[in-house]
Amino acid sequence: MEIKILRSGENYLELQIDGEEHTVGNLLKGYLLKVPGVKFASYSKPHPLIDSIILKIMTDGSISPKEALVKAIELAEEDTNKFIEEVKSIEKR
């Protein structure tokens, strides 16, 4: 995975994430939209044969786009850990 900044501003960030596809793009977009202060989050896959996505984040200024992305990843990690615990508890039944 390689991340390149395409555009950056106080409330806007556009990243190219090489080596990733719809799975990561959709996951990040969904969790970004749960972060307070995020006004807009989207991703696109410019070409179907190239493993690369473009992620766009816009905030209202109460949080930076980079902070919002980190928070979104932390939220995804928390939910993943909860899911792991649920799966483990199923095995014990």
From Swiss-Prot:
Any one Pfam family match given in the protein's UniProt record, by short name: RNA_pol_L_2
GO cellular component, one term: cytoplasm
Membrane-traversing stretches: none
InterPro entries the UniProt entry points to: RBP11-like (IPR036603), RBP11-like_dimer (IPR009025), RNA_pol_Rpb11_13-16kDa_CS (IPR008193), Rpo11-like (IPR022905)
Enzyme Commission number: 2.7.7.6
UniProt subcellular location: Cytoplasm
GO BP terms: DNA-templated transcription
Top-level EC class as recorded in UniProt: transferase
Reactions catalysed according to its record: RNA(n) + a ribonucleoside 5'-triphosphate = RNA(n+1) + diphosphate
Keywords: Cytoplasm, DNA-directed RNA polymerase, Nucleotidyltransferase, Transcription, Transferase
A molecular function (GO) term: protein dimerization activity
Coiled coil (UniProt feature): none
PANTHER family registered for this protein in UniProt: DNA-DIRECTED RNA POLYMERASE I,II,III, DNA-DIRECTED RNA POLYMERASES I AND III SUBUNIT RPAC2
Family: Belongs to the archaeal Rpo11/eukaryotic RPB11/RPC19 RNA polymerase subunit family.
Function: DNA-dependent RNA polymerase (RNAP) catalyzes the transcription of DNA into RNA using the four ribonucleoside triphosphates as substrates.
NCBIfam families xrefs: PRK01146.1-1
Quaternary structure note: Part of the RNA polymerase complex.
Protein's name according to its UniProt entry: DNA-directed RNA polymerase subunit Rpo11
Source organism: Sulfurisphaera tokodaii (strain DSM 16993 / JCM 10545 / NBRC 100140 / 7) (Sulfolobus tokodaii)
